[in-house]
A protein has these predicted regions:
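Metal-dependent nucleotidyltransferase catalytic core
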Residues: 1-43, 48-97, 254-286
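Intrinsic-disorder-associated interaction segments
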Residues: 2, 6, 100, 104-107, ...
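Short hydrophobic/aromatic-rich motifs at helix boundaries and adjacent loops
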Residues: 5, 32, 111-116, 138-141, ...
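Short amphipathic alpha-helical segments, especially helix-boundary/capping motifs
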Residues: 9, 115-121, 143-145
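Glycine-centered small-residue hotspots that permit tight backbone geometry or close packing
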Residues: 22, 106-109, 196-197
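Short, exposed beta-strand "edge-strand" segments with a Pro/Gly-rich flavor and a Y/T-containing core
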Residues: 66-75, 99-103, 175-179, 190-191
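Internal, well-ordered alpha/beta segment that forms a basic, Gly-enriched binding/recognition surface
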Residues: 77-134, 138
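Conserved nucleotidyltransferase catalytic core and NTase-mimicking acidic/glycine-rich helix/loop elements
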Residues: 126-292
Length: 292
């Protein structure tokens, strides 16, 4: 059902842009599960556009169809350029897209130049080391925050962002990125670990962080991954924290998907509470990886 809806929705977006925003939009692009083969019956379509004018931003829409949430959002050329320079973690939004509308051949060529630049950067060892270091340092700053007095939901959110940053660091360090997004990040990290000389503990601590039941476990295991990845890519950190040993393995993919999705949702709920005064929801207080 979702696939049929999504296919119709793509046609609707194309027609709406051509009919109402032809002069206002540079490009409309699809990415994510709809084009990479990881869609399930509850998948949306991941779609963004690059505006040409202020009016173009009016194309942005958030809505629900058949119980599935959709978000058609804008991204400017500057942000796309930052992604190509590996300064952002949204690399598939430039590297793995299907363009369904372009204002002109020149706009298309401009985007293709960004893709070529990104490909060049992914082959440049110096650029990759700097990008990996930046992500590891960002993870360390999050770790410093996680060690402050925080409720469980905040600790779980921070721990989730720590391991996502570190997974990105490992992937970029190895001339790659997660083409299939958060949904398959752990599986792709395991695959990368088997193909490259990546410490297995990186995967173990990633999984233990997701499975953590207490604040102390979340802190300990996210820091365990921080130490392991930092040592692997040559970034040192000043603090030490005892780490325990654990077993790794591929648990149900749904667990990782739900955990990281919950982390991202918690961030959005926190932003809405802070910016708009909406009611506060601490959904991560109730997350249990083995009781979904």
């Amino acid at each position: 059902m979702s696939k049929a809806i999504n296919e119709k929705l793509v046609v609707w977006i194309e027609e709406k842009v051509k009919r109402e925003y032809a002069e206002d939009i540079s490009l409309v692009l699809l990415y994510g599960s709809f084009i990479n083969g990881t869609a399930n019956p509850k998948s949306d379509i991941d779609c963004y556009f690059i505006p040409r004018t202020e009016r173009g931003y009016e194309l942005a829409k958030t809505f629900i169809l058949a119980g599935v949430g959709y978000d058609i959002f804008p991204m400017d050329w500057e942000c796309a350029g930052n992604i190509a320079e590996l300064e952002e973690c949204l690399i598939p939004l430039v590297g793995d897209v299907k363009i369904i509308y372009s204002f002109s051949a020149e706009e298309l060529k401009r985007f293709q130049r960004l893709q070529a630049k990104m490909k060049h950067n992914l082959a440049d060892r110096q650029v990759l080391q700097a990008a990996a270091r930046k992500r590891a340092e960002a993870a360390y700053k999050l770790y410093q925050d996680i060690c402050k007095p925080n409720p469980l939901a905040e600790i779980r959110k921070l721990a989730g962002h720590i391991i996502m940053q570190l997974a990105d660091a490992v992937s970029i360090y190895n001339h790659d990125y997660f083409h299939r997004g958060l949904k398959m990040q752990f599986q792709d990290l395991l695959k990368l670990q088997k193909e490259k000389d990546i410490p297995l503990r990186s995967c173990e601590e990633y999984l233990h962080t997701i499975q953590a039941k207490t604040a102390e476990e979340s802190i300990r295991h996210s820091y365990g991954m921080l130490c392991t990845v930092g040592e692997y890519i040559g970034v040192g950190f000043s603090e030490e924290l005892a780490r325990d040993d654990g077993e790794s393995g591929e648990t149900a993919g749904m667990v990782k998907d739900i955990s990281l999705s919950a982390v991202c949702l918690q961030r959005e709920l926190d932003d809405a509470h802070r910016e708009y005064g909406s009611e506060r929801y601490d959904i991560l207080n109730f997350y249990e990886w083995d009781n979904l």
